[in-house]
Design a protein with these regions (language model features):
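Loop-to-helix entry region of an early transmembrane alpha helix in multi-pass inner-membrane enzymes
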Residues: 71-86
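Transmembrane helices and adjacent periplasmic/lumenal helix-loop junctions
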Residues: 120, 129, 149-187, 203-210
Length: 519
């Protein structure tokens, strides 16, 4: 009876771990899954597998990426991740069972501690899933070897077997092999410290000989456990501001504009990234002219930030460029973002957008290269095949120049962007971004987002003369029944020289002036 109770207790604990983790990732943190998925592109090819396992820890990395690709479907990704946490808890529970004479409820609860540590560690957005996969595999292999007695308990034969097995496991899972070594030392009851020290020395010499191209520090701490080379996970947990920005980017990616505006009213993260996301959402709801200064604005970079070589900052600006019709700028920002992924991986999200930009510009040969890559993935394959068929149809029509009537028709996304984009290629500096918005509007007066961004950028820059000069464009091309509230407030502020109580724009101007004086 007691055995049955213990068995049900243990399985009940595992079920609770699975349910808790599933709800955490699917209900509260789906944006964290999306963040991880968008910075890799798992390919279903033999070459990709060989490329991965040619590096130490490559198999764990391959398995981790295999799981992460399913984060594209949130509930499925959350389910697989929850199952991995359950696997971690179960292998630890079995290990404790093998090391103790009896399994008490306290021992079962102790099996939750490594799960909690791994969960908290994964709050660092740069921790890769391969770390957790490697830990599970290390404990699991040690448990199997110990249970079957494959290498014996003591003696030179057992040590020789470990010397052969440890490098093999290292090549599969990376430095997490030392978890295996420690467990085996406990299982075999080795009493001589020189044996473990000698084993470590042999392993270090083998790694230095096999991996001359990698710094020993990186080889010993993992090539694929952390996104940033030669750095280590931070014990930071789930930083509220960081994950709020990740959530906004996730909502932008999925075009959930109402949720962005709602969240912006509840919690603000005072960064240009946050402003870019919120202002883009306002523009898509045609609320930018009315409500822009109801929210925090970081300054001249509140609509579009200048080029920044990291893997996150430029994403909302790239999405804004795409919807404005500044296709080349969107492509440049997405390309720079992809090349800024420090572990050298590709991005499914960026690759898809780059291909779309090439299609809009009529660069079909280069677009096909991106499409061919996406066809080897799981969740981007259907889109890639659809784009390939569309390009073939347009090519067969023998169109010498891109035509909005193709690529899905004039009312398709590609058709609209071809009508809105610049017709000539030229260079511009970030300081002239307001002029670029104005040129977009003159190129196509139906581009209401360009109109909103043009006037908003002048207000952000403090260019009140330009704003007054071009305000009539809002009446002429904006489709407004009355002047937007934000523009009315700005005009009152300008006319009263900022002495307007409760004016959102006046408050913005005063804050900018105070910040500049502080510098």
């Amino acid at each position: 009876m007691k055995k049955a109770v213990k068995r049900y207790w243990n399985w009940g604990l595992s079920v609770l771990v699975g349910i808790g983790m599933f709800l955490f990732w699917y209900v509260w943190y789906p944006h964290a899954l999306s963040y991880q998925e968008q910075y890799q592109l798992f390919l279903w090819t033999g070459d990709y597998f060989v490329e991965k396992i040619s590096l130490p820890g490559g198999f764990a990395d391959w398995v981790g990426e295999f799981i992460v690709q399913f984060y594209y479907v949130e509930w499925l990704g959350a389910l697989l991740l929850a199952m991995l946490f359950v696997a971690l808890q179960r292998v630890i529970l079995r290990l404790l069972n093998s090391l103790t004479s009896h399994l008490s409820p306290l021992t079962s609860i102790l099996s939750l501690l490594p799960v909690a540590v791994m969960w908290w560690l994964m709050g660092d957005i740069n921790v890769m899933l391969s770390l957790m996969v490697a830990v599970v595999m290390a404990i699991g292999i040690a448990g199997i070897v110990g249970k079957l007695g494959l290498l014996g308990r003591v003696g030179s034969l057992g040590i020789a077997g470990e010397i052969v097995l440890v490098p093999m496991i290292y090549w599969l899972i990376g430095p997490a092999v030392w978890i295996y070594v420690i467990i085996r030392v406990i299982q075999t009851g080795w009493r001589q410290l020189w044996t473990a020290g000698w084993l470590v020395a042999v392993q270090l010499m083998v790694y230095a000989w096999l991996l001359p191209q990698w710094p020993l520090q990186q080889a010993m701490t993992g090539l694929s456990y952390y996104r940033i080379p030669l750095q280590y996970p931070q014990w930071s947990g789930y930083d509220k501001d960081m994950y709020e920005l990740i959530r906004l980017d996730y909502l932008v990616r999925n075009e959930r504009w109402d949720e962005i505006v709602k969240r912006a009213g509840e919690y603000q993260v005072k960064t240009p990234f946050w402003c870019n996301c919120v202002n883009l959402a306002l523009s898509q709801k045609r609320l930018l002219a009315d409500r822009m200064f109801d929210f925090y604005q970081s300054g001249e970079d509140a609509l579009i930030i200048p080029r920044t070589r990291d893997l996150t900052s430029m994403l909302p600006s790239a999405e804004a460029f795409w919807r404005l019709g500044m296709v080349n700028s969107a492509q440049r920002y997405m390309f720079d973002t992809q090349e800024s992924i420090l572990n050298g991986k590709k991005s499914g999200r960026c690759t898809k957008r780059i291909a779309e930009c090439m299609i809009v510009n009529g660069h079909y040969q280069t677009a096909r290269k991106q499409i061919d890559i996406l066809k080897k993935s799981l969740f981007y394959r259907s889109w890639a095949e659809e784009m390939e068929a569309m390009i073939e149809a347009e090519t067969e029509a023998d169109q010498t120049t891109p035509n909005p009537s193709y690529s899905g028709g004039e009312n398709s996304v590609f058709g609209k962007l071809r009508k809105m984009r610049y017709k000539e290629s030229f260079l511009y500096s970030y300081e002239e971004i307001d002029k670029m918005f104005g040129l977009l509007l003159m190129n196509n007066t139906d581009n209401k987002m360009a109109l909103d961004y043009f006037l908003a950028q002048m207000l952000l820059n403090g260019n009140v003369q330009g704003f007054q000069q071009y305000l009539g464009l809002a009446q002429q091309y904006g489709g407004y029944r009355q002047m937007p509230l934000g523009y009315q407030d700005a005009m009152r502020c300008i006319q009263a020289q900022g002495n307007v109580a409760g004016s959102p724009y006046a408050n913005y101007v005063k804050r900018m002036m105070a910040e500049r004086r502080g510098k």
